[in-house]
């Protein structure tokens, strides 16, 4: 189906405390939808210059968690944030089997074509970094630079990291989480909780369990592990239904390590020194991708651009300059 673009304009006022360095005080947004082969993909654009598309994690989150932290990049680049299929403001699908990395690669390509981006830069964070790797394997000729943030090239290796994260928990927390997981994580609690994690599990797993690996230096004061902003049907299909510390949905097929050497474009890999996606994973990608650059941010968890916003922005600008 022909890719169609529907747009509107609005203005977003920036936070005065976004960064200590000077930046524009008003960020103009173009927003709209691209019909990506029958699936409506939401996007937002800021700035002008060479295009930099940014893809989020989850899977099943949205681009919102990047804002306002990445907005200073619009001084030099045309930023394109998308919500992946089934996420954020993009279209939810009845057939959950359509939630795959491969289909999302085609969505990214459809947005690139529809917006006339030509050869673009691509940044992926967390699961978005998995998507960015997959896009590079298929459409490398359409990329100028690749930026892989706090991500992993292998689900089996990521699952080994989760084992270590659990081992480092207090015995009491680990026992609580294991008990909830063994009883099944869905179909419990109040009616509105039965198709997602209960608040009790989210607070234990995302709050107590993950928090030290999300933030180190500068925790987001609004972080709420019980907030319900996910696309749960997508999450269960891709991540799985057996908890936060094992990926056993369709993402279990992600094993890219032996293909990383085929990425020949300039590539930046970064993560936090206490990242949920352990630095060893970024070091492996750096070793396998020829000529790649590696930055490990100090005093930083998974949300590197929150913990170290100035360092993060500078590293991206230096790499793309």
Residue ranges and their predicted role:
Residues 39-92:
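Conserved HGGG/HGGXW glycine-rich cap/lid loop of the alpha/beta-hydrolase fold
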Residues 84-127:
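Active-site loop/oxyanion-hole signature of alpha/beta-hydrolase fold enzymes
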Residues 118-161:
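Conserved hydrolase catalytic core segment
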Residues 147-191:
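Flexible "cap/lid" loop of the alpha/beta hydrolase fold
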Residues 179-258, 265:
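Alpha/beta-hydrolase
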Residues 263, 269-271:
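Short beta-strand/loop motif that positions the catalytic acidic residue
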Residues 276-281:
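Conserved alpha/beta-hydrolase "acid-adjacent" motif
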Residues 292-321:
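Catalytic active-site module of serine/aspartate enzymes centered on a nucleophile-bearing elbow/loop
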